[in-house]
Structures are given as structure tokens and as C-alpha cells.
Amino acid sequence: MRIGILSDSHTETELHREAIEQLIGEGVEYLLHAGDIMLEEHLKMLAETNLPYVCVYGNNDMALIPFNGQYNIFQEPYYFTIEELKIKMMHMPYFMSADADMVVSGHTHLFESELKGETLFINPGEVCAREKPLSECAIVDVIENKFNVTHYFKQLGQASWTKREVEV
């Protein structure tokens, strides 16, 4: 199973589109967005991929509340299952107990990936390139209950993404 993860798109529509295209080009089967989506246009882009997707509200997503029920966006922490993988997703990294197979967060704008016991904690970094001149996203491959994490990042102004396999 191949899961694409992004967070913190903010108002950077082109970077949001490019991150989604990168993840789709890498063959993801699911998309997760860990909040600070900010624009309905960004939710539409996720929905229009025709891939199963799940989003959580971030601290800057008040304008998206009227679209509750129209898109797959939920309050944090949101628990759900993909195939047999139990996932907890939030924007703010406040609910960090290991009560799921994978815990996804955003907000810090920093890529992080750590396996604690049998739980993968992952923050894909920032799509918006606000804190640093990098747009980021991640892919988690789940193979026989093992996690393989790949961090994708692109310097602003560059056409191609850099791929980095991450030890977990």
C-alpha cells in the first residue's frame, strides 16, 4: 500500500498542485493532508484526483468549515483505517500517543519520521515553502506491516523533485 502525505499548503496553489502531481506520479493509492489547506480550491484538487483522500482541519482552516460534509475533511485528531492500517491524523502535534499504527501531523513545517515501537510518527513537512525555500511531501509504503518512508522536496524555482529514502 502506498500513501501520499502532505501538509501546510497554505495559499500556495501551484505548489499544492505540484505536490499532488508528484505523489500521483509516484503511484500513490491514497492521499492524506494534515491541515492548513486554507482554500476550497485545494480540497477540490484532492477530490478531483479520484483517489481516496482524508484531510484534517488546521489552525488556519476556518474558511473551510462551511464545506464540512462536502469534502473528506475532519476535526483533529481523526482516527480512520486504510485497509488494515489504523491511522490517527492531526494538524497540531498535540495528540502524539502511540494509539494507532501511524500518527500523521503537520503544523511545524518540518519533515519528521520516527518509528517508536510499532508506531510510525510522520510529519511530511510543508508544501508552502514558507519556513524554508523547499516544498515537501512524503510517501509511506506499507509492506507486510513494515514502513518505508520517502521524503520528497523541491527547491523553489526548480522543476524536479529530490527523493530521499528515510530510515525508520
What is the meaning of each model-derived region?
Residues 1, 71, 76, 159, ...:
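Non-catalytic interface/targeting segments
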Residues 1-48, 62-64, 68-69, 134-136, ...:
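N-terminal active-site segment of His-dependent metallophosphoesterases
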Residues 7-11, 35-37, 59-61, 92-93, ...:
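Active-site metal-binding loops of divalent metal-dependent hydrolases
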Residues 16, 98-101, 133, 157-166:
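A short, polar/proline- and glycine-enriched secondary-structure boundary/capping micro-motif
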Residues 50-95:
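Helix-adjacent hinge/juxtasegments
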Residues 54, 81-152:
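Conserved beta-sheet core of the metallophosphoesterase superfamily
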Residues 142-168:
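Charged phosphate-binding loop/patch that engages nucleotide di/tri-phosphates or the phosphate backbone
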